[in-house]
Every structure is written in C-alpha cells, then in structure tokens.
Amino acid sequence: GYPESHDKDRMMYEAITNGNGAGAFPVNGNLTNALNRMGAIGATSILVPGPKMIWHFAELGNNQSIYTCDNGTVNDESTTVPGDCKLSTKTQVQWTENWLSDTRRTSILSDWSKMIKLKTTEPVFMGDHTISPDASNVRQRIYIYDNSFPTTQLRNVVVLANFSVANLTINPSFPTDVYTYPMTWYDLMNNNAPVVITSPTALISVNSGRFRVFGNQPSTLSNIDFDVASNEILVYPNPAKNIFSISKGANQIEIYTLTGQLVKSFENIQMEQE
C-alpha cells in the first residue's frame, strides 16, 4: 500500500489546495497545519503490516504540484488539457528553501525513520492487524498484534491518529483478552515512555493532525548510534570473484545479489579467513 502515488498529485499540495479550511487547525492554505499531519499519515500507513511504497520520505512534505509548469502555473488533471506540465523542469525547492533547516520538514524524516526501524526490527509487525475507527475516519485506530507471542514480548501495538481540524479525545479500546487494568503501556514513538492506562476505554487526548503509538512492552530499539569509524570492517579484494577476506572476525556474514537474493551465508568467521 501507499499514501500517495507517483501519478497523482502530492498529498501536501492536495491538502493545502483542497483540504478542510474550517476548524481551529485548518489545512487548506495552512502549510504548517498540513505538514503536522505527515507523522499521522506515516503511522497509519507505514506501521500497517505488509510492504509499503514511499518516495524520499514523501519528499519531506513537498507541497509543489507535480503539474507545475516552467512559469509557475499549475496545469493539473482538472484543466481542459490535463497534465501538460507534469514533465516540465521544476525548481528543486527542497534545496532552494533549505528544508533541512525547517523543523516542520525534518520532523517527517525523523518520525518516518523511527517507524521504519520499528516495523523492520519488531516481529509483531509481521503479524495481523485490524483497522477500527472511533466513530469516524478522523479518529483513526489501528491494532497490530501477534497472539502467538507472550505478553512479556511486544505482542500488541495500538495506533491512534487524529485527522480532524480540532483537538480530540479518542477511545483507544485497548485489548483486554490477556490484559487487566490498570496496566502500563509504552509510548513507542516517545522513547518508550510509560503510560498508566486505568481503563481500556479511558479517553486519550490527541491533538489535531497528531498520532500516538502504544505497545504493551517497550520497543527493543536502541537509541545508540552505530559508530561506523570504530566498527569499520574491510572486505577485500573488491570486487571479488571466488574468495574474499575480512579485516575483523564476525559471527555471521551473508552475501546478497544486487536484486536482494541470498547467495551464501557464513558463520563464525575469523579475521583474515578466506
């Protein structure tokens, strides 16, 4: 699945052009409010089990129409001759406007990166899921679970998202099959901060365009960056045909083709072993 397609206009352009202009936090014509929703969009798409297609972290919320012409006008699918300017050369606004210094943009990169790490390292995201909005789609709830796991492991994840133009409370309807309340859940996108839940239906406040991700156990993700310099491993010769050596010992080495196919796996390799 995917939240936006390469042959349809960008989410942020659609939001600020055709989005809801009412309420306390309108998105129509309000780039900040629109960008604030990108985290929730990621949470309700990336975290759902199964493959996802994204492009450059949604281009950090690029709000330029894909149908922008050389002169700055937009010739989209609603015009008499639609899509004339889809292939026109466009200003790369992410560089001219220095988006890497814009926290509204970089928060998308940060949030989506965390979600990708969470999904690709926690086995529960290989399990099942249920989508069950609270009364309407603006109060979105997604339940991700693997009932074969013990409760001492991360076996349940609850995603809440508020797509309204107002701050709302959401009934989380936390699972009760193997849990008793009060109990502690963990905010997986906030450094595993513990949250005491007194009742599975106790309302949780979620600001407009925001989201929460709860787990029955903390994520095992480490916050420590991998130090490439001190953990450098050299493989030589490169390229190699029949044999190669490594500069350090390793518990396991796997070799893949450029298309992702596993070619060979080695275990307990010693330094300089061929």
Task: Go through each PLM region and give its residues.
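Surface-exposed beta-strand/loop patches in extracellular or lumenal glycoproteins
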Residues: F163-Y179
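Residue-level detector of functionally pivotal "anchor" positions at catalytic/ligand-binding pockets or at interdomain
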Residues: D128-A135, N216-Y236
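Glycan-recognition and catalytic regions of carbohydrate-active enzymes
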Residues: G50, I54-F57, N62-V157, G215
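Solvent-exposed beta-hairpin/edge-strand motifs
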Residues: P175-N192
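Conserved, mostly hydrophobic/aromatic
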Residues: H6, S45, F57-E59, M115, ...
